[in-house]
Amino acid sequence: MSTQPMPLSLTDAKPGQGEYRVRAGSEIRALLRRFADEELPITLATPDGVSYTTCLWADDPERAVLVLSADAADARVQRLIEAEEAVAVGYLDSVKIQFDLNGLMLVHGRDASALHAQFPREIYRFQRRDGFRVRPVGHACPELQLRVSGPTDTELTLRVLDLSHGGLALFLPDDQPALPVGTSVRAARLALDPLTQVQVALRVVHVAPLKESAHGSRLGCEIEGLSGVASRTLQRYIDQTQKRRRLLAVS
């Protein structure tokens, strides 16, 4: 799943991309509302290579402001607000969403800091070609079972928030051991349902705090190793989940 932006200045987009441009205020609000409601990760990027993953905490079209989570101690946050250009990139199901960030500033609150940006006037949508990310349907959510090495080895069972053939997102409760960016897990067990389990190797590529009421963080992980059987099993689960979502949308 690539979080690399298309050409950083959206006005420089290639001919033919205009059909993916969203300018209607109601459509822009609907897209951003999904990022906030589903607590989906958004990667902020600059032309000189700064990349920072965050979540949209609030969108306020009346005040024309976006509010994104931020760690004030992270040097990348300061580089973002000092940059002349910045772009936000995220995914909604099979579509890459991208928009320019203007007026980016760091705001300090009593309990947390946040990034504020101007509400976007337009958003670009790019159809993904490298697979689909799905969120579990129903109450039986997939889980990842892994062992964390340390002074005392710890067994963790983490809920899967969404997954694709190339990666997955996990919910890490605040009271569990941290899994920082770069952590590699060579032998984890992905339980797709009570009867279906596959072995995976993965690496943590970003960590983003969720809303305070969630009491945890979202871990974005790349899948680095799948056997042929495991790959087919995972693809079958993704296909079945997509079909179930379409049926629920129609009913």
UniProtKB/Swiss-Prot annotation:
Keywords noted in UniProt: Bacterial flagellum, c-di-GMP, Nucleotide-binding
GO biological process terms, semicolon-separated: bacterial-type flagellum-dependent cell motility; regulation of bacterial-type flagellum-dependent cell motility by regulation of motor speed
Pfam families: PilZ (PF07238), PilZN (PF07317)
Entry's localization field: Bacterial flagellum basal body
Domain PilZ: 127-239
One GO cellular component, as annotated: bacterial-type flagellum basal body
Gene3D superfamilies (alphabetical): Electron Transport, Fmn-binding Protein, Chain A, predicted glycosyltransferase like domains
Organism superkingdom: Bacteria
GO molecular function term, any single one: cyclic-di-GMP binding
Its job: Acts as a flagellar brake, regulating swimming and swarming in a bis-(3'-5') cyclic diguanylic acid (c-di-GMP)-dependent manner. Binds 1 c-di-GMP dimer per subunit. Increasing levels of c-di-GMP lead to decreased motility.
Protein family per UniProt: Belongs to the YcgR family.
Subunit structure: Monomer. Interacts with the flagellar basal bodies.
Protein name: Flagellar brake protein YcgR
Organismal lineage: Bacteria, Pseudomonadati, Pseudomonadota, Betaproteobacteria, Burkholderiales
